């Protein structure tokens, strides 16, 4: 092979390397979704979101008004607006619903009967609210690591989810801070629902 052909071969290889490195373009941006996270005080909303953001649990303080966290996942970023769950704050929840693309409802599966009833009433209100009723819901039955925790089937029956949420996009999942794999899987399922809703909107 002549020196000219060798030089041409090397130049062509350099060109291919240049195309691979410089013309590939940036990776596609992850989609972002705006979510609202609600639930009674003590249900564990702040702790779960902080854990997903790899924040130290030692610094967790219950939310009294609202806070916003960007929770990163491999295929999406969830901008979660967490609302405080105290009695005097819950009546203002609906003021913060506008612009939400999905809902996270956290309940304490080991709570007292009174608190569980209050959580059921709040979830029923959210599922029927005009600004939320068409959105995907992730319902987390938290504190499954506690001895008094109710099972997902017990929660589903007590909350009357089958008749109330019929025709809606919703997921009910058990969770605890001790099982991050299950928690991340729950959010992955929610992201799938959000993507499905996006695709449906594009087709319409």
From Swiss-Prot:
GO terms for molecular function: GTP binding; GTPase activity. InterPro entries: ARL15 (IPR042292), P-loop_NTPase (IPR027417), Small_GTPase_ARF/SAR (IPR006689). It comes from the Eukaryota. One of its GO terms (cellular component) is extracellular exosome. GTP binds at residues 39-46, 82-86, 142-145. Keywords: GTP-binding, Nucleotide-binding. Belongs to the small GTPase superfamily. Arf family. This is ADP-ribosylation factor-like protein 15. It comes from Homo sapiens (Human). The lineage of its organism: Eukaryota, Metazoa, Chordata, Craniata, Vertebrata.
């Amino acid at each position: 092979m002549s020196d000219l052909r060798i030089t041409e071969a090397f130049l062509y290889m350099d060109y291919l390397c240049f195309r691979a490195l410089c013309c590939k373009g940036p990776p596609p941006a992850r989609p972002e979704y705006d979510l609202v996270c609600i639930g009674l005080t003590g249900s564990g909303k702040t702790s779960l979101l902080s854990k997903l953001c790899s924040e130290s649990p030692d610094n967790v303080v219950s939310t009294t008004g609202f806070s916003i966290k960007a929770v990163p996942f491999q295929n999406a970023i969830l901008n979660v607006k967490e609302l405080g769950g105290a009695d005097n704050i819950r009546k203002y929840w609906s003021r913060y619903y506008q612009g939400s693309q999905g809902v996270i409802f956290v309940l304490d599966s080991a709570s007292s009967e009174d608190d569980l009833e209050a959580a059921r009433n709040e979830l029923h209100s959210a599922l029927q609210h005009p600004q939320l009723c068409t959105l995907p819901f992730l319902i987390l039955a938290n504190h499954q690591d506690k001895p008094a925790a109710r099972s997902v089937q017990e929660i589903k029956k007590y909350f009357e989810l089958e008749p109330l949420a019929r025709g809606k996009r919703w997921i009910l999942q058990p969770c605890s801070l001790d099982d991050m794999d299950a928690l991340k899987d729950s959010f992955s399922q929610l992201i799938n629902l959000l993507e499905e809703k996006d695709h449906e909107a594009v087709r319409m």
